[in-house]
Amino acid sequence: MVSSIFRHRTIFVLAAMLCSIISSARPSARASVAVVTDSITYSHASSAIEEYISSMRLDGKRGILLIDRWGVPDSLRAALKNLYEHESLEGAVLLGDIPVPMIRDAQHLSSAFKMNQQRDWKSSSVPSDRFYDDFNLEFRFLKRDADKPELFYYSLSEDSPQRIRSAIYTSRIKPADKAHKYELIDSFLRKAVKAKKDAAVINHVLFFAGHGYNSESMVARMAEYKALHEQFPTIETNGGKVDFINHDFDESVKDRLLAGLSEPSVDLAILHHHGYNDMQLLNGSPYVSSPDGWLSLARNYFRVKMRSSRNPDKLKADFINRYGIPAQWLEEASDPKFIAQDSLYSRSMDIYPEDVDAHSIAARFIIFDACFNGAFIEDDYIVSHYLFSDKNSTLAALAHSVNSLQDVWCDEMVGLFSEGVCAGNIYKNIWNLETHIFGDPTFHYSSLSSWDAAAGRGEYSDKFWRKAIASKEVHPDVKALAIRKLARRGSITPEELIDIQSNSSSEIVRLAAFDGNAEIAPDCFDKAILLALDDDYELLQRLGAKFASYNQSPTLAEKAVQLFLDPLTSKRVLFHIKSLFVTIDGEKAKSLVRSTPYWKGEDGKESLCRYIDSNTSSKKVDIDNLSSESIDLRSAKLFIRAQRNQCRADALDPIAEYYTRCSDPDIKLLIAETLGWYRYSYLAPHAQSLCQSLLEKESDPRLRAELTKSIRRISE
């Protein structure tokens, strides 16, 4: 172990020394971008790499070549940090076979990833380049993967900050096609250089909404359409437009969407849908209005179920008895004709890599608001097919290496593209653990402006950013950036943010102010939530409802009931309000229901009161189980784990009390980690106090570490 540690430290120093040797001697005040590549990739594509590095000067930046000769993440991180400290490093392009940090014990830094870490390490870790771009985060090396040696596992330390604050941006240029990867890298870099010479303005934005996304709320779609016009205010005056495609425009919308993405005028695409690493999931079962259509869908459903069953004979008998359907329908499952028919039908619902390869995608930047589309550790990932095709104009993309949350501000600061800011300097201020830029992070529309440097660097003063917020001429996304910068410095108060949220005429700025308070999570967060719940911007109201379900302050109860009973509450807002509604004290909830107008009338109210009674009873069973002498451990673990999403106020003390009596270290570890999720709760100070009390009495190093981490998560 000692020799291993010594060897890693030696590599650390060598990498730092190498940076000073290969760095350009130009003035360090000029922003630099490191192109990090392995020696084999460099030997195959050196001409294109050098040309790409040289092209940085077209943006007024310096390119720096850094060849990874060791293949160890710690060495590269040290080298990048050295460049940041001494060479004004702005970002890094990870080109070719660069080692992949696989992060564990940091699920709170992701938007949605909450997998049990006892499962396979490849599946239960997050591939994340935050290891390379956030120098404040501290990690412990765990091991190198035996099957995929490019994967290195790290645990986020309890001594580390528990929030992402990237100092630089990073991107991956990594073709999925291993047989032709060097040719593809060469071709892509030449495409990127050409684009720098021919930069064009952004005139045409296309966004898409897939099946099952955001509860298929059309209010959410309309609100996004309106918001994009605010984020790109000159787009129509310049002869451009914002277009929208919904999944239900066609039974199979794939061809329409691919054709839209291939329109030569499309500059930027925002794609909201579900996904896998090699699939973009677009359509579900179509809406049909004829008996023939219903029967066709039903027969397809039964055939698919039969084929996936482990006991088809039993399932066949069950279907016949339950639905009274002909046996012939079920026998079709093994008919080659129907197997081929169903396969083609299923294939028509979604986008696969070969579909992308068959088109000429025009969008130069694409946001993949989907799970796993950027899973670059897999043998194939669909983002690669958009980037590495001579026919495609795509130069950069934003995507996720694991699953991602639906209800986030996906279009956050995207309007900075129209203000002359490059992709990297936009998204380094936004991303989560799983978020990655793929392709050229220095990509931008039109020419870069002074806002690019302001977005990328930290030396701009509070006065500078406050002036931006106060200006009537400044773009709303620049104001959003200013709010983010000030909030992360602790240079703007919660009360100031509430004032902005109350008085700004811009829905983008109001949302940015609310988001700033969500980062701070102050005692007055419930006031910001109440303002959000009354806002006419659907996304702000929706995020207000989401955070309300975490906060659960009694001051939110009346508004929650009003929205829950209001026939005009939009579908996705209602989804989150229901999560808050079920946490309200049963008697109080019934009283509020009975005193609030409800479009379903008195019968509807009584039905709702019965639901409240049932829910109250169910909650009592779960909480009573924690104090029972004959505790159901399986139910207890499920209940505790559920609080990572629910953060129920009435569960906080019972969970902490159970920790003191529990003898199972794995359950205690789960509790210690769960308490940290109460960061947005109105009981957050109490949760922190409970963690501190448990820590003072705990001797197990692993549990002490997790409690320490939870204290940091709540307090930072």
PLM features: residue spans?
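Bacterial Sec-dependent N-terminal signal peptides
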Residues: 1-29
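Amphipathic alpha-helical scaffolding segments comprising HEAT/armadillo-like alpha-solenoid repeats
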Residues: 459-470, 490-501, 522-533, 553-565, ...
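Structural detector for internal amphipathic alpha-helices that build alpha-solenoid repeat scaffolds
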Residues: 477-489, 508-520, 541-553, 572-584, ...
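Caspase-like cysteine protease fold
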Residues: 410-492, 498-499, 503-515
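Short inter-helical turns and helix N-cap capping residues of alpha-solenoid HEAT/ARM repeat scaffolds
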Residues: 474-475, 505-506, 536-538, 568-570, ...
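Structured catalytic cores of large enzymes
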Residues: 74-251, 260-265, 277, 281-290
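Catalytic cores of nucleophile-dependent amide-cleaving enzymes
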Residues: 124-188, 296-409
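Catalytic-core segments of thiol-dependent peptidases
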Residues: 84-103, 209-379
